[in-house]
Amino acid sequence: KVAQIAHDVEIECKTGLGDVLASYYGGFEIRDKPGAPGIGHVQKITLNKISIIMICFSPISTSKFIKERLPRINGLGGKMVNKLLESKNYEHFQEMSLEFAKYVDVMTPRMQKVVNELSKNNIKCGIALFGETIFSMIPKENENKILEILEKYSDGIIIKSELDNTGARVLYN
């Protein structure tokens, strides 16, 4: 019930399009039916020993972004979900993420520079739509290689995380 309320607030305030559903289920998921938890549906893909490393340079207004680009987002997004449902591959997801970011025109020159450098080093990456943010889902043993590259960009904030397959929950009482 709480997650359904959070979803409604997210939509009303235009702060996201399905982030609550993803957070609720956790892990790497493909949203095959939009909506709040209990209404929407995801297909979970269990990934083990994967790190997510990202660099964020600046935020963007999510509500402004959604308002300006929603028709383009929905057009290509649905087609990409179908492709991803076939492959169920996180590397393919990152490739499509880059394609999608270019299509909705969110790539800044600074982001493109990072993407190019990662690509030259055979590191796949994608674009998060909550700011000037590049992410990479990589096997844990390859973390140092990407961190070395990203640390050159002192104007960005680097975040390293693990993929949590459990989803939102109360950690402490």
How should these model regions be labeled?
Residues 40-173:
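C-terminal nucleotide
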